[in-house]
């Protein structure tokens, strides 16, 4: 990616954990990358799925801010906090970049209700941890079950799994839909399967077992 930087480059986005694969960038590789990025290029780290990560080597964008003033960290209340319908999140950066963002931001984009819900969510850390830990445990269980079935799955640090199904994607999607399971599919590439409630995950496991047989 650093080789693609030119004089016209102004912003670089890094998504970790990545959507739709769930893979993460590690601290050492990000630090090495940042050393090759000019200081006038802003590096935005999208960490929407940060709370689901259990890889100790994964980068935490907040730890980079002191030494890299061109880094901006984005986080959201839509994923782990469960406030997707309220459309609220935040950016963490230097005061200079924050001032630039305020100058170009559309006013009144976040409602009072969304702000109150976000503040309340920050105070409910125990509930957040319980919910995230349950999802992570289910992610591991579903990963193990589907791997035993023979599916090629990328180890994920998000609240979903990526199945590399290639040319068979559309057929597998039809089987899943016939079992009442709806996933995000990319034809000829793969399927992103979100981790839900235990019973929902069981249904997905059963549907995919039938897709293997099909």
Summary of predicted features, one role per range:
Residues 1-8, 20-43, 47-78:
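Active-site pre-lysine segment of PLP-dependent enzymes
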Residues 11-17, 43-47, 154-156, 184-187:
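Short beta-strands and strand-loop turn motifs
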Residues 28, 32, 174-214:
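PLP-dependent enzyme catalytic core of the Aspartate aminotransferase-like
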Residues 70-147, 151-154:
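PLP-dependent aminotransferase class I/II
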Residues 86, 157-159, 187-191:
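Short amphipathic alpha-helical segments
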Residues 135-136, 140, 144-179, 195:
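Conserved PLP-binding catalytic core of the aspartate aminotransferase-like
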């Amino acid at each position: 990616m650093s080789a693609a930087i030119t004089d016209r480059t102004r912003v670089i986005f890094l998504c970790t954990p990545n959507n739709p694969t769930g893979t993460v960038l590690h601290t050492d590789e990000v630090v090495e990358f940042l050393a090759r990025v000019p200081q006038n290029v802003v590096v935005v780290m999208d960490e929407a799925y940060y709370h689901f990560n259990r890889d100790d080597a994964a980068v935490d964008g907040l730890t980079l801010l002191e030494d890299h003033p061109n880094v901006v960290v984005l986080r959201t209340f839509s994923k782990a906090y469960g406030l997707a319908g309220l459309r609220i999140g935040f950016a963490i950066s230097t005061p200079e970049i924050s001032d630039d963002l305020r100058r170009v931001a559309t006013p009144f984009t976040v409602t009072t209700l969304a702000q109150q819900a976000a503040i309340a969510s920050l105070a409910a850390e125990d509930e957040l941890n319980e919910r995230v830990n349950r999802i992570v445990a289910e992610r591991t269980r579903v990963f193990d079950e589907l791997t035993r079935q023979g599916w090629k799955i990328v180890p994920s640090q998000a609240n979903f799994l990526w199945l590399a199904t290639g040319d068979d994607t559309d057929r597998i999607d039809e089987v899943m839909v016939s079992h009442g399971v709806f996933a995000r599919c990319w034809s000829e590439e793969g399927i992103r399967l979100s981790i839900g409630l235990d019973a929902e995950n069981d249904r997905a496991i059963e549907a995919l077992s039938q897709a293997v047989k099909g």
